[in-house]
Amino acid sequence: MENQLFQLKFTSKQLEKQSKKSEQSEKAQKIKLKKAIEQGNMDGARIYAQNAIREKNQSLNYLRLASRIDAVASRVETAIRMKSVTGSMANIVKSMEKSMRNMDLEKITQVMDQFERQFEDLDVQSVYVENAMNQTTTLSTPADQVDLLISQVADEHGLNVGMQMGSAPSEKVQQGETDELTERLNRLKQKN
């Protein structure tokens, strides 16, 4: 199973590299698109635009597949850990049976202590695995933070994404809130 885990992780890394190559190719196609537009070559521009879109989609597909393979690798890694814990617990149970037959109370106590430690380790690993699985299968970043970051990046580059995002805050609302707060502050200052 360790070999399969290695192969999964290796494949995921390869797909991530392919995704980056496709991103670079997309950027190159966009540069060619810009040059074609500047030269008035609209047929060429259309071809470069199609190529850029295809490369972008290919990059996203590679990234999605890499993410899915990472999730599978995480599950395989969990199975390997559980197999190890299960093997340890099986050995402890055998030791318990042997001690019970001999009725050696000291050995029974030692085996029970060891069993309890293994069981606690299993609980800790189960919680860790459950958290890791939740992180790989759900989106943990709140949507409002994602929208805010998109808006910030768009503003930095002078891009307009207000129409594309329904939840992006408008500057008028932010300005209104600022004006209201300023007025309240001024009134409080005047009272004192």
Swiss-Prot record:
Region (Disordered) residue spans: 164-192
Coiled coil: 7-35, 102-125
Keyword hit for Lyase: no
GO annotation (BP), single: protein targeting to vacuole
Location in the cell: Endosome membrane
Membrane topology summary: Peripheral membrane protein
Top-rank taxon: Eukaryota
One CC-aspect GO term: cytoplasm
Keywords: Coiled coil, Endosome, Membrane, Protein transport, Transport
Main location: membrane
Family membership noted in the UniProt record: Belongs to the SNF7 family.
Function: Probable peripherally associated component of the endosomal sorting required for transport complex III (ESCRT-III) which is involved in multivesicular bodies (MVBs) formation and sorting of endosomal cargo proteins into MVBs. MVBs contain intraluminal vesicles (ILVs) that are generated by invagination and scission from the limiting membrane of the endosome and are delivered to lysosomes enabling degradation of membrane proteins.
Subunit composition and interactions: Probable peripherally associated component of the endosomal sorting required for transport complex III (ESCRT-III).
Record-given protein name: Charged multivesicular body protein 1
Species name: Dictyostelium discoideum (Social amoeba)
Gene: chmp1
